[in-house]
Amino acid sequence: MMPYLAKRIGRSILTLFIIVTLVFCLLRLMPVEGYFANYEKMTEAQIQAGLQSMGLLDPLPVQIGHFWRDALHGDLGVSHIYKLNAPVTKILAQKLPISIEMGVLAMLLSLIFGIPLGLVMGRCKGRWPDKLGTAVIVLIQAVPAAVYFLYIQMYGTTAMGVGLLFDAADWRYWVLPVCSMSLANLAFYAMWLRRYMVDESNKDYVKLARAKGVSESGIALHHVFRNAMVPLVQYIPSAFLNTVVGSIYIESLYSIPGMGGLLVTCVQRHDNTMVQGIVLLYACVGIIGLILGDVLMVLIDPRINFGKKEGGR
């Protein structure tokens, strides 16, 4: 396990370096307005002096080296437009908690409803619970997410009597965005578990359990479901982190002061330093999720040996 993790972490660091460096280079191709709050009022001499003080006139390899040197010391620079001269790390620390809270609640909701739904659909293959559940899941997956997000907001805010401006102190404002964020993962868990249970229903270990007189409920819960949880658990950390990262549209829709809305605002206002910091954070979050998934798989099923698996690739 440890050699595999060492290789995985090494590859992850390389991936992180490539992603963030590529974004860093792409941002350097954009207009320089993103580094000045009052660009329209500045003279050319002032602009050049400002770029020089920020090191943006240095050769690109030098700029990349300085960025990573500062990033390794926890310095991601300062915002030039979103909050003038405010440290990027401080802004991220203020915005990240609410996105994580939303992601945790959405993940719990998708697990609480998705797993039982998948179990029921798998046990009732071909009957009305399976057909109804499949129809709902296909609808969720087929309709563009933006469409049902808008409908949920349009009718949900009226039904619950909430306004369009998010109020973190009122639990009612959390219900609609959390439900919206949970739908995609709920559909995935339910359909995946249903398919797994149907595929496993004729395996030898299931037939042996039936021959021993084990009830269908016992087979589903103690045999099939236990095996299904191994690959499912690997997906949970990355799904949670993807929920946090992918909440951009929902946070903007409900005016939630989280990471998603922050990214949209900074891109629209060309705050390049903030965009760099957000991309670095998102890349770290995604990579950590993938590694945690592998670790959880081994903790749940010690029979898994990544060392042998890695060697056979």
Spell out what each predicted region is.
Residues 19, 106-114, 177-188, 260-298:
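Hydrophobic alpha-helical transmembrane segments of polytopic membrane proteins
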Residues 109, 133-187, 264-266, 272:
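Generic hydrophobic transmembrane alpha-helix motif, especially the helices
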Residues 16-65, 156, 160-173:
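Hydrophobic alpha-helical transmembrane segments of membrane transport/permease proteins
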Residues 170-210:
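Membrane-cytosol interface at the C-terminal ends of specific transmembrane alpha-helices
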Residues 2-9, 117-153:
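Cytoplasmic-entry segments and transmembrane alpha-helices of multi-pass inner-membrane transporters
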Residues 9, 16-17, 21, 89-120, ...:
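Transmembrane alpha-helix signature in integral membrane proteins
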Residues 56-115:
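An internal, D/E-rich "acidic patch" concept
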